[in-house]
Amino acid sequence: LELSKLLPKDLIVGLEIRPQAVAIVEERIKKAREDGQAKNACVLRCNVMKHFAHYFTKGQLDKMFFTFADPHFKRSNHRRRIINQTFLAYYAFALKVGGLCYTITDVKDLYDWQTRHLDAHPLFERVPESELKEDPCYIAIHNATDEAKKVDRNEGSKFAAVYRRIKDGTKKASATKASTVV
């Protein structure tokens, strides 16, 4: 709900597959609305991997957030990871040119997977860390989410990266050199 405070003129839509998580967020939104907050926030229960393309039109989104996604540790389940080459095409379609894709996790292997796939995609370029120091959304994903606070309590590490949606064909050749992404 922190994002609804940071971006009061934007609609904040959370998409989640787990019914329990949706119920918790719905309850928090309801409580926040009683206090006059979170009027621009909602959560929908859906399978993003099946239905994302049905929710958004081309260039509709300014920002996307992938916060503490399920790492699907088993190699046989890596295809279920929310960031992969196939779904990055959908995300690039919905994200406007110049829009930002924020990722954060406490699992180094997942971070490496996400950055490898985003680095390899022709429609995303990484935003340098120096540009993010004052970004309130970047700060919020590190400090304001329940999962981020849990990682802090457990003295864990957080790994974050932000990518900008770029115009077709504008990615530098050196950044798109041939590589195998698994």
Regions found by a protein language model. Give the residues of each.
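The conserved SAM/SAH-binding core of class I Rossmann-like methyltransferase domains
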Residues: L15
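S-adenosyl-L-methionine
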Residues: E26-D62
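Conserved SAM-binding loop of SAM-dependent methyltransferases across substrates and taxa
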Residues: L1-K9
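A short SAM/SAH-binding and catalytic strip from SAM-dependent methyltransferases
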Residues: M49, Y55-F56, Q60-I82
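Conserved SAM/SAH-binding beta-strand->alpha-helix loop
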Residues: R18
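Conserved class I S-adenosyl-L-methionine
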Residues: S76-H78, L100-H121
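A short glycine-rich, Lys/Arg-flanked "PGG" loop and its adjoining helix->strand segment in the class I
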Residues: R81-L100
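Class I S-adenosyl-L-methionine
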Residues: L110, Q114-V182
